[in-house]
């Protein structure tokens, strides 16, 4: 998988068996800091089958007791489970092979000739890594574990491919709302001192 922190690797080891038991796959796991940490998990049904909010809710319910028991994040945090969306992240070996011919953005964990960020078209994937034809017509080959970020670029061709695969809602106007989020606040309810409302 793409480069993870030690904490993210620990979290992945906890939630991945839950996802597999439900016939799902973890696409990306990320912990974002701030006043309240945010644990973001993107997942899809095995094999890239169309995934909906019910799948996310089921996965979230399955993961919550596991995370609560292990307590991998010591402070209050928010858990978000969502589908990858159209301009999905590419994080695992094999992800690039599914999207040959589509535009991609990549950020490497370590720079090549002083450069870390690249944009181009996926031309293949093999044991050496993903093959990308860059916008300047040069070529890049990089393994997934050498990347810190990678995602598809939203184009008309990508939207059509997602529609054909059944990964778009029936209403065209909903293209930008493709993520099916299911959020759980892992902290106790708090009262707003100004309004008295429970948050």
From Swiss-Prot:
Signal peptide feature range: none
Spans through the membrane: none
Source species of the chain: Hyphomonas neptunium (strain ATCC 15444)
Keywords, alphabetical: Cytoplasm, Ribosome biogenesis
PANTHER family: RIBOSOME MATURATION FACTOR RIMP
Stored Pfam families: DUF150_C, RimP_N
Name of the encoding gene: rimP
Location of region: Disordered: 165-199
GO cellular component terms listed in the entry, alphabetical order: cytosol
Name of the protein: Ribosome maturation factor RimP
One GO BP annotation of this record: translation
